[in-house]
C-alpha cells in the first residue's frame, strides 16, 4: 500500500508542492532560483500540445460516419460555452458587489505604478475582436505549429479532417499514419509526466520565494473572495450541470485529481491538456467530441477566468473609489462577453484581457491594474483549476447531447476506487 502511494503521481506532485512552499518560504532566494524547473516542464508540455490536438481532431473527424455530426457537436459546444461563461461572469459580478473586497482601501490611482502595467496595456490595445478572429487563421501551417497557437492548429486540423474524410478509402493510409503518430505522441507525454513533480516543485518554490506568503495579507480579501467564488461555482453551477447530465461532480474531480494537482503546481491549465484529452476518451466520450470541445474550450469556456475578470474590474473600482452604477456594470458585462473569448489566445492570458476590458469600458482607471499585478500569480491557480474542471464537464455534457457518450464506461471510471 505504502509502495503504491509513493508511485502515485497524485502523491508525488502533492509532496513536491509542499516541499516547494517550504523552500520558498524559508529560503526565498534559493526558491526563486527554482523557476527554470517549472518553466521547463510547462515548455515540454507545450511542445506536444499542437501535435496531440492535430492527431486527436483529425482522427476524430475523419473517423466519423457523418459530417453533420461534427457541425452539430461544434454548435452545441459553442452554445454551452456562451451560457456557462455568462453565468460565471454574472456570479463574479454579484459576489464582488456583495462582499466588496476593495471597499475602504481609498487608493489614489495617480499614486500607482503605471509603468508596471504599461506592457500589458500595450498588448491589450492590440487584442480587438477583429484582430482575435483574424489571428485564428494562421499565416502558414508550419507557423501555427511552431507558435503553438491552439486555435490556429485546431482550424487546420478541422479542415484536414474534413478533407481526409472526403477521400474515403483513398485516405485510409494517411489516417492510419496519423493514428499511429498519435500513439507515439501520447508515449512522449507519459515520459514527460514523470517530471511533473519536479515542475510543480520549481513553480511553487519560485512563487512563494518571489512574492512571499506575507505579501498576500493586504490584498488577501480579494484572493479569499475569489477562491470561495470559484469553489461555489464548481460545486453548485457545474455540480448542478453534472447532476442533470447523470454524474457526480465530486467523483469527476476525484477522477481528474492528478491533472488538477499538476495545474495547481504549474498554474497552467495547458499543462494538463494532453492528459485531459486521454482521460475524457477513457471516460466514454467519443474522440471526435473530445478533440473539438477540449481545445476550443481553452479559448471559449474559461469559467475561472470569467469570474476573475468581473471581480478584478469591480475590485479596482471599489479600491480607487470609482463609482460604478448598474449601467456601468452592465456595460462591463457586455464587453467581457466579447473580450473574455480571447483569453487563452494571448500571452499573459486573463491579465491582458482585463487590461483590454478596462480600456474598452473607459470608466475605470487603467493604473488600477497595478493593484492586481502583484497578486495575479496567486489567483491564477483557482482560475486554471476552475477552467480545467469546467472544460471536462463541458465535454461530457456535449458528448451526451450528441449521443456520443458511453455512459456505462463513464460510470465505471468515476466509480472506480
Swiss-Prot record:
Its main location: membrane. Gene3D superfamilies: Sodium:dicarboxylate symporter (1.10.3860.10). Disulfide bonds: none annotated. The chain crosses the membrane at residues 8-28, 44-64, 76-96, 142-162, 184-206, 222-242, 326-346, 352-372. One of its GO terms (molecular function) is succinate transmembrane transporter activity. It is found in: Cell inner membrane. InterPro entries: C4_dicarb_transport, Na-dicarboxylate_symporter, Na-dicarboxylate_symporter_CS, Na:dicarbo_symporter_sf. GO terms for biological process: L-aspartate transmembrane transport. One of its GO terms (cellular component) is plasma membrane. It is a multi-pass membrane protein. Keywords: Cell inner membrane, Cell membrane, Membrane, Symport, Transmembrane, Transmembrane helix, Transport. Responsible for the transport of dicarboxylates such as succinate, fumarate, and malate from the periplasm across the membrane. Belongs to the dicarboxylate/amino acid:cation symporter (DAACS) (TC 2.A.23) family. This is C4-dicarboxylate transport protein.
Amino acid at each position: 500500500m505504502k509502495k503504491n502511494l509513493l508511485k502515485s503521481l497524485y502523491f508525488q506532485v502533492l509532496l513536491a508542492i509542499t516541499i516547494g512552499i517550504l523552500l520558498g518560504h524559508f529560503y526565498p532566494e534559493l526558491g526563486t532560483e527554482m523557476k527554470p524547473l517549472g518553466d521547463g516542464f510547462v515548455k515540454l508540455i507545450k511542445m506536444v500540445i499542437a501535435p496531440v490536438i492535430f492527431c486527436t481532431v483529425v482522427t476524430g473527424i475523419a473517423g466519423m460516419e457523418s459530417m453533420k455530426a461534427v457541425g452539430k457537436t461544434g454548435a452545441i459546444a459553442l452554445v454551452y460555452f456562451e451560457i456557462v461563461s455568462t453565468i460565471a461572469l454574472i456570479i463574479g459580478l454579484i459576489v464582488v458587489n456583495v462582499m466588496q473586497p476593495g471597499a475602504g482601501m481609498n487608493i489614489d490611482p495617480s499614486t500607482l505604478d503605471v509603468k508596471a502595467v504599461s506592457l500589458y496595456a500595450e498588448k491589450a490595445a492590440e487584442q480587438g475582436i477583429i484582430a482575435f478572429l483574424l489571428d485564428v487563421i494562421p499565416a502558414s501551417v508550419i507557423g501555427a505549429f511552431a507558435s503553438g497557437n491552439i486555435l490556429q492548429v485546431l482550424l487546420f486540423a478541422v479542415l484536414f479532417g474534413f478533407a481526409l474524410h472526403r477521400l474515403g478509402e483513398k485516405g485510409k493510409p494517411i489516417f492510419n499514419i496519423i493514428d499511429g503518430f498519435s500513439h507515439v505522441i501520447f508515449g512522449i507525454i507519459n515520459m514527460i509526466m514523470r517530471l511533473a513533480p519536479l515542475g510543480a516543485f520549481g513553480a511553487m518554490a519560485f512563487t512563494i520565494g518571489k512574492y512571499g506568503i506575507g505579501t498576500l495579507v493586504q490584498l488577501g480579501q480579494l484572493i479569499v473572495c475569489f477562491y470561495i467564488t470559484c469553489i461555489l461555482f464548481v460545486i453548485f453551477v457545474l455540480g448542478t450541470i453534472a447532476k442533470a447530465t447523470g454524474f457526480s461532480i465530486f467523483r469527476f474531480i476525484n477522477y481528474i485529481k492528478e491533472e488538477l494537482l499538476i495545474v495547481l503546481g504549474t498554474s497552467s491549465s495547458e499543462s494538463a491538456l494532453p492528459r485531459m484529452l486521454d482521460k475524457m476518451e477513457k471516460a466514454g466520450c467519443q474522440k471526435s467530441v473530445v478533440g473539438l470541445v477540449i481545445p476550443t474550450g481553452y479559448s471559449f469556456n474559461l469559467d475561472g477566468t470569467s469570474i476573475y475578470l468581473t471581480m478584478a474590474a469591480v475590485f479596482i473600482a471599489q479600491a480607487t473609489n470609482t463609482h460604478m452604477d448598474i449601467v456601468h456594470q452592465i456595460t462591463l458585462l457586455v464587453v467581457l462577453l466579447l473580450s473574455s473569448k480571447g483569453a487563452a489566445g494571448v500571452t499573459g492570458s486573463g491579465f491582458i484581457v482585463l487590461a483590454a476590458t478596462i480600456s474598452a469600458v473607459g470608466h475605470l482607471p487603467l493604473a488600477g491594474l497595478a493593484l492586481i499585478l502583484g497578486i495575479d500569480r496567486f489567483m491564477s491557480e483557482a482560475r486554471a483549476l476552475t477552467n480545467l474542471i469546467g472544460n471536462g464537464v463541458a465535454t461530457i455534457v456535449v458528448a451526451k447531447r450528441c449521443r456520443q457518450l458511453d455512459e456505462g464506461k463513464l460510470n465505471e471510471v468515476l466509480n472506480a476506487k
